Amino acid sequence: MFVDIAKIYVKAGDGGDGIVAFRREKYVPAGGPAGGDGGKGGDVIFVADRELNTLLDFKYKRHYKAQNGERGGPNNMHGKDGEDLIIKVPVGTVIKDAETGEIIADLSREGDRAIVAHGGRGGRGNAHFATATRQVPRFAEVGEKGDELWVILELKVLADVGLIGYPNVGKSTFLSVATNARPEIANYPFTTKYPNLGIVYISEGESFVLADIPGLIEGASEGAGLGHQFLRHVERTKVLIHIVDVSGSEGREPVEDFIKINEELKKYSPELAQKPQIVAANKMDLPDAQAYFELFKEEIEKMGYEVYPISAATGMGIREVLKRAYELLKQQKAAENIEEDAKPRTFVYYKKKDVKPLTVRKENGVYVVEGTVVEKVARNIVLNDHDSFRYFQNFLNKLGVFDKLREMGIQDGDIVRILDVEFEYYE
């Protein structure tokens, strides 16, 4: 089964907690704090692998989580970092943030990497909180949470040349004759529901990848038929072979079909419509095809396109079309200065997080303090003794929280809440 789109959840590892510990050595009577820091959580990293050609695995498994960092140890021992989670995807995979639609990375080269979720920082051990006036801190930080998000994976087939045209015009037959591919072929529309790939050999050392893309219909740019699936794959190709049935056997109007498909390409992407395009007038082996062809050729050449008469059923004219496609492909690669041995790239994504300003409001008699900075500290410090609470109070004072509370008329004994932390206020 060919699967070319998937939605999955990824979660980076949480940071390990810092710990509270003190040196316990025989000849060191006042060893001081020695709690180690927690390890960093593992990242979630996507890697492009040319051995894969479908997103099928993600149909059955949709949740992925990297390893958490380990707790710190005594004697200032740093906790072990969590292992990164490597997720392999086919070359040609585009990764998007499912919430915003933002493109995170386009993994179009073998070995391309995308770090999409970052592991949480490890919490600091109590050794970090020792000061001249707080020589025996009995508190530490917990590790930060790792990033989490839903992402959409879209596979865009990496073919050099794409076969386009209305359903049932002979694209699959053309592919089977031109390559060793064995696509499903039948006399009804949308036989091809997924891209079929084959290798075209022009001569020794000269070849290209040819894709039979699912049939396109009017309205495809708005998603009709297999529209968006079709157009997503066409984006990757550098040259298009537009196959048109000129026999009239299906009761269609060849020139009208040609114009409509190019209109759909342009609606979806103006760049797509500018790709070099060879027109292959198919089914020339059928009766009356020659008469239709002469009229068709005259109209299409007026638009500036090259037209080749072919018969996918007999093989007539196909070699000439393939040679011309290869010539155009070489020109495109030279113009784009594409390096076949281009080095892999690394994409790094940081999901934008809302930064909340410091605010204080009164709700049901409780003073509620909110803000990104103050909430981060409240989340990371375990407030379980006098030392930790004193540290937290000093932080709030420096941040200006107490000044805001006084401005609002707070009285001794009133309750203050930050996240799930509540305490009584006293001057």
Swiss-Prot record:
It is an enzyme of class 3 (hydrolase). Signal peptide: none annotated. Its main location: cytoplasm. InterPro entries: G_OBG, GTP-bd, GTP-bd_Obg/CgtA, GTP-bd_prot_GTP1/OBG_C_sf, GTP1-OBG_CS, GTP1_OBG_dom, GTP1_OBG_dom_sf, OBG_GTPase. GTP binds at residues 165-172, 190-194, 212-215, 282-285, 311-313. GO terms for cellular component: cytoplasm. Mg(2+) binds at S172, T192. GO terms for biological process: ribosome biogenesis. Monomer. NCBIfam families: Obg_CgtA (TIGR02729), Obg_CgtA_exten (TIGR03595), PRK12296.1 (NF008954), PRK12297.1 (NF008955), PRK12299.1 (NF008956). This is GTPase Obg. The gene is obg.
